Amino acid sequence: MSRKSIVQIRRSEVKRKRSSTASSTSEGKTLHKNTHTSSKRQRTLTEFNIPTSSNLPVRSSSYSFSRFSCSTSNKNTEPVIINDDDHNSICLEDTAKVEITIDTDEEELVSLHDNEVSAIENRTEDRIVTELEEQVNVKVSTEVIQCPICLENLSHLELYERETHCDTCIGSDPSNMGTPKKNIRSFISNPSSPAKTKRDIATSKKPTRVKLVLPSFKIIKFNNGHEIVVDGFNYKASETISQYFLSHFHSDHYIGLKKSWNNPDENPIKKTLYCSKITAILVNLKFKIPMDEIQILPMNKRFWITDTISVVTLDANHCPGAIIMLFQEFLANSYDKPIRQILHTGDFRSNAKMIETIQKWLAETANETIDQVYLDTTYMTMGYNFPSQHSVCETVADFTLRLIKHGKNKTFGDSQRNLFHFQRKKTLTTHRYRVLFLVGTYTIGKEKLAIKICEFLKTKLFVMPNSVKFSMMLTVLQNNENQNDMWDESLLTSNLHESSVHLVPIRVLKSQETIEAYLKSLKELETDYVKDIEDVVGFIPTGWSHNFGLKYQKKNDDDENEMSGNTEYCLELMKNDRDNDDENGFEISSILRQYKKYNKFQVFNVPYSEHSSFNDLVKFGCKLKCSEVIPTVNLNNLWKVRYMTNWFQCWENVRKTRAAK
């Protein structure tokens, strides 16, 4: 009988194994073993030729999404929060109707027929690898939906799976962001050769990663031929560029920076790092780079990097120490009017005050046109709109004050008592704080929300002592140069009884178990501290708040009609523009409806973002005169680049229309 695949076996060919028979006698029941012998026996699955995953053909599917019209006013629209917790799942009340059309390839379902089995068996791994490589190299005709944090392709995932992925990204170690996972291989020894010992594997050298050449959008060029690099440390060192600028201290921007970054064996010329004071101290703290290799740029002042080129650094409204840089080139011995102006935003959250400050510096040199703008295009997709930072901070702080004043039951309309109520001692509390507020944060960033809560509650900010975060926060508070945020080191404390607001890593708020683990760590600092707490409330600043249904855009082949519609959108947005940037305010009701009655700890997602929303970018591009806009994010998708370029052209049309009036 020839060997067959399991899909070729007929039911009639499967024989059951005979079971033991029992015979009974008049004297009692006696079990007798079956003496029947047969040449046939039951087969196990391992005896059949079952196709494995490596033999199966690889299929793909394409997704297309309907485009939705967007209203320029989001005043009456509640922000929908896509969990970043780690960018847990919450009940969303959304009434918008979303139409999603999924076009599945006919070859998506794999059907195995008798005449195909042999063909599948003959396919080798080399052939499959070749097919995969071909598929990777083929340009995808559908839009690639990426995670804004690690830029991984999420197109093949369902919506809830995309949310879960972003939860993992936000809660993971920032140093791992944007780096591919290592392939895990099983090493099987060859029977003809002895297996490698552990010592041999340990002593084997890892291959050296070949650094890529600096991409063009990382290099800024001036008329006199001078060149500088911005946020480009993970590439092959240039033989002619010695000035490197770091916009802020986030891992996706300083990646590649290390203590030996100026090693003469690797670098043809000695380099200098330019950054803000806070960023310089953090770089020195983390990488031990000598301060004599770092040039601190003063805030809101002109600094000359050559005899004819200057840079003005302004607050980027991102994380502490983040800056936007206005480079201006002048003719020798003529500094009245610059011949070239370049603006690099780094990562930034645009607002009306920032735009006015840039326009003021441009007006001082009698040249209001920027030749090139290197723009942070993280949320450069229609629909990525969220409230201003000021609105979110004020609303969340007001909510905490209301919760302290009225209590959880009255605030949420819940008569059920918290478990902490029964655990708490009946004696007077050892400190005056009944509710513990946990605010999620990155290595650096999101501190504004926690500090605003401290101001409302008149309490200090607690950070775990002897931690890297404590050292960083102390550095930020001691060297704060932002005139809008009057912070000082007296705000920070490591005494549990001086604070009811704790700054914690976002991963602490991922689940009830991780919060329990954090409270356990507090018990190690002081045994009786947790017993006096009645409630624990956490806030996850997500930034992923937008009108549902506008997240994904359908590709439109009619560029002319699309351009016309986009221009109208920009004109309408500018017509209804307000100076206070709070037309899309955040309301307490958005927090209250996330309440989970049966959860021991309440965790709320709030749409606090340190990146510019889509509408922020539109206002920025329509108000500033610029000849060319160069995106710095979402450049790995050709359609996305064209999509952004169309919007840049619309901004130019709007500027011309407004100037003609």
Curated annotation (Swiss-Prot):
Zn(2+) binds at residues 147, 150, 165, 169. SUPFAM superfamilies: Metallo-hydrolase/oxidoreductase (SSF56281). Its EC number is 3.1.-.-. Induction: Expression is increased by ultraviolet light and agents which induce DNA cross-links such as nitrogen mustard and psoralen. A zinc finger (UBZ4-type) spans 144-174. It comes from the Eukaryota. GO terms for cellular component: mitochondrial matrix; nucleus. It is found in: Nucleus. Residues 1-44 are annotated as: Disordered. It is an enzyme of class 3 (hydrolase). GO terms for molecular function: 5'-3' DNA exonuclease activity; 5'-3' exonuclease activity; damaged DNA binding; zinc ion binding. Keywords: DNA damage, DNA repair, Exonuclease, Hydrolase, Magnesium, Metal-binding, Nuclease, Nucleus, Zinc, Zinc-finger. One of its GO terms (biological process) is interstrand cross-link repair. Residues 31-43 have a biased composition (Basic residues). Belongs to the DNA repair metallo-beta-lactamase (DRMBL) family. Required for DNA interstrand cross-link repair. This requires cleavage of cross-linked DNA to generate DNA double strand breaks (DSBs). This protein has 5' exonuclease activity on single-stranded and double-stranded DNA, which appears to be necessary for the processing of DNA double strand breaks prior to ligation. Present with 259 molecules/cell in log phase SD medium. This is DNA cross-link repair protein PSO2/SNM1.
